[in-house]
Design a protein with these regions (language model features):
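Charged/polar low-complexity intrinsically disordered segments, enriched in acidic residues
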Residues: 87-126
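Catalytic core of non-heme Fe(II) oxygenases with the double-stranded beta-helix
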Residues: 1-91, 96-97
Length: 132
């Protein structure tokens, strides 16, 4: 069994519908329990194949093309869910993610003045772009 290439539906839920911005896959059993079954995500610069330890999770943009390769033996157990972000636009979420990574790298190098400037930029972009 596998799951063909697709992007996730833009809206999830029943009566309380929400926008699916981020997809979540939680691996409930380990890679040794089955053959195949990799989560394959098209990153735009190639395909990333993911098969993680039990209890591990992967988050990825819900609009990313992805599939699950065929399970050839054993059983693949996962839980999937979706998250609505306060930042609707995936490009803006990527910018914020890059800023957080840069901020954390600056913090590791103990540069408090530059850290504060990057943190201020992050906070102000959140203020501009976030939706409750």
């Amino acid at each position: 069994m596998g799951y063909g290439t697709h992007i996730d539906d833009p809206l999830m839920g029943g009566a309380s519908r929400y926008r699916s911005d981020v997809s979540v896959t939680v691996f409930l059993n380990g890679p040794a329990d089955y053959e195949g079954g990799e989560l394959c995500i098209d990153t735009g610069s190639g395909e990333t194949r993911i098969k993680l330890a039990a209890g591990s999770a992967v988050l990825y943009p819900a609009n990313a093309r992805h599939s699950v390769s065929e399970v050839t033996s054993g059983e693949r157990l996962v839980a999937v869910s979706w998250v609505q972000s306060m930042i609707r636009d995936a490009g803006k979420r990527r910018i914020l993610s890059d800023l957080v990574q840069a901020r954390d790298a600056i913090d590791r190098h103990r540069d408090p003045q530059t850290y504060s400037r990057v943190e201020d930029a992050y906070v102000n972009l959140m203020r501009m772009w976030a939706e409750p």
